[in-house]
């Protein structure tokens, strides 16, 4: 991954914008619950560009990426991505789209628990 001070390539920013406008139902629901500090005051960004990746949701204070997966996920690419991010100190919390839609409260509790633990352990 490039150093954090480098500007993002224009195409990377544009792709993140496109992903924000074509969100899945699960992403829309979760974003409604995460935006504007609604989850315990935690600040999340959606479709956050972190080259070479774009993270579904990212909490910088906790260095936590939340990825919502459908049936197309779960392969070697996801494992390599998680490994790359973990080397940067970012934990990846993978959840299924169905979970976000059907068990929203449980998903939010898990995100809050993990984020809170990471923030507390960083002090």
Q: PLM features: what roles do these ranges have?
A:
Residues 1-42, 116-123:
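Solvent-exposed, charged helical/coil patches
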Residues 18-23, 46-115:
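Basic, amphipathic alpha-helical patches used to engage nucleic acids or provide basic targeting signals
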């Amino acid at each position: 991954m490039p150093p954090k001070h480098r500007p993002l390539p224009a195409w990377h920013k544009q792709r993140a914008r496109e992903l924000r406008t074509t969100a899945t139902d699960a992403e829309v629901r979760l974003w409604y619950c995460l935006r504007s500090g609604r989850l315990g005051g935690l600040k999340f960004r959606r479709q956050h560009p972190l080259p070479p990746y774009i993270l579904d949701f990212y909490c910088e204070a906790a260095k936590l990426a939340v990825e919502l997966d459908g049936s197309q996920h779960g392969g070697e690419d996801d494992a390599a991505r998680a490994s790359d991010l973990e080397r940067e100190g970012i934990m990846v919390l993978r959840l299924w789209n169905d979970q976000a839609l059907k068990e929203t409260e449980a998903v939010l509790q898990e995100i809050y628990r993990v984020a809170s633990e990471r923030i507390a352990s960083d002090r």
